[in-house]
Amino acid sequence: MTGNQPQTTGAAPPSVAEVTLRLKAVMDPELGDNIVDLGMAAVESISAEGVVAIAMKLTIKGCPLRVQIKKDIESRLETHPGVTKVTIDWGEMTADERTAVMTRARWNAREQAPDTQIPLNTRILAIASGKGGVGKSSVTVNLAAALASVGHTVGVLDADIWGFSIPRMLGISDRLEARRIDGIEKPRMIPNERAVGKGLLKVVSTGMLVEDESTALMWRGLMLTKAVEQFLNDVHWGELDYLLIDMPPGTGDVQMGLARMLPRTDLVIVTTPSVSAQKVAIRAADMARRSFLRVAGVIENMSAFTCEHGESYPLFGEGGGQTLADEIGSALLGQVPIEAAVANGGDTGEPIVLTSTGPAAQAFLAIAANIMNTTVPVTEMGGCTARDPEAVQVAISKRN
């Protein structure tokens, strides 16, 4: 019935409402909703001969889901009595329409997310990078300390399961303990705490489970994801104003698991000024887009070194942070200069924001203020979110 000539059925053509109802059975497996409610599909016309014309907008014209969606539309409509032919007029969404789709997809992800022990009013920030060596953990502990110093209760989750470093960088050596909480049958792990200024840090890390920090954790993907689930479900976090998650580098199992379990997370991307680091860091932003997470902004770490004579030297290049922020349509939250005291603070367990008034400490405090005072805008969907076509096909087959 999709050839050039409409077929004759003898039945009356369907109504717009009937066709729309059938279109609602067609799902976009990546966005997790039907193509009507996503604003992708609408009935253009229904002729007296039963020819049904559908207007279909994709996030981008070259979206690899086009073939599958076409087959799904045709199979749903062609079996309806009175339909003699189905035509599809393909188009592309505007920027505003893509933003609306992203908003709905994010809402769907939140509705479908499992319950965790993280309070619903807690702002969650995942500190991420495309690769290691950019100072992501240093940024995490200094931002956490800066937020706590002004009176906030801040959770710090060390999700870098293999490369845990948060306990040492915050000067916490106690192991995690589990105990029963009033009204809760199952014992829960209790975060280790450190008072900072007017506030409090609550810290959880696999480094607090092993015998000593030199112990290697030889865990594979499923075990990594399970560990993160336990940190979210089996830890008694209590009230938190912020939860900062020190992410492992890259875009692997832990990142995908956290995006699924905590879809209200805002991503903060750490990069150095070099172009090569910026090109790797953009993958973290792409992961956020594909997982419907918002990007709170970019932090450029190790931006420049200033000598005792006041001369500034861009040892790792310059401009990478702003370039990355511009490319992903986000904000540059700040630039942290190179100071030996930052590394020394990590070695001694005293974040520089607690011991110094120098440029690096001031940069971290300013970034924390930006985070506290800024509402993250809805991120525009930069393009099609479709992943590997085989994975998409598996999702479709499971639905059917």
Regions found by a protein language model. Give the residues of each.
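Extreme N-terminal, non-catalytic leader segments
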Residues: D37-M40, V52, T59, R66-S129, ...
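Flexible beta-alpha connector loops of hexameric P-loop NTPases
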Residues: P64, L209-M223, I269, P273-S276
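Walker A/P-loop phosphate-binding motif and the immediately C-terminal alpha-helix
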Residues: R123-W162, A281, A285
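Phosphate-binding loop that captures ATP/GTP phosphates
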Residues: L147-E213, M218, T225, L232
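Conserved catalytic-core segment of NTP-binding enzymes
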Residues: Q230, D234-W237, D241-T348
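C-terminal boundary of histidine-terminating zinc-finger modules
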Residues: T348-G358
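Short edge beta-strands and adjacent turn/loop segments
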Residues: E30-K57, V336
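N-proximal, solvent-exposed amphipathic alpha-helical segments enriched in charged/polar residues
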Residues: T2-M40
